[in-house]
Amino acid sequence: MSEELPQRRETHPEELVRNVRERERDTWQWTSIRVPEEILQRWLAMLRSGRNRKKVYREMQKWMWIHPKGPVIRACGCRLCNPGWGT
């Protein structure tokens, strides 16, 4: 008896990009309503320049790992509802 390895489904580049964007969006939605005000304002300012998206994403992931049950402290994490450094 020989077992076959499971076949991996081929993914197209467009699908990979979509999955990354969805993961980033979900991470932002989870962390932006839970992080302290200072951290959120710093992230918004970093995202404004555009070059720091990966760095902010890594910091969000680290924050999620450290605070897996972080309480919701604001209703929305968008730039319009939280003006500050990034405006």
UniProtKB/Swiss-Prot annotation:
Localization: Virion; Host nucleus
Recorded GO CC terms: host cell nucleus; virion component
Coarse class of the protein's main subcellular location: virion
Motif (Nuclear export signal): 40-47
Pfam families membership: Lentiviral_Tat (PF02998)
InterPro entries: Lentiviral_Vpr-like
Motif annotated as Nuclear localization signal, chain positions: 48-55
Keywords carried by this UniProt record: Cell cycle, Host nucleus, Virion
Task performed by this protein: Seems to function as a Vpr-like protein, since it mediates host cell cycle arrest in G2 phase. Cell cycle arrest creates a favorable environment for maximizing viral expression and production.
Protein name in UniProt: Probable Vpr-like protein
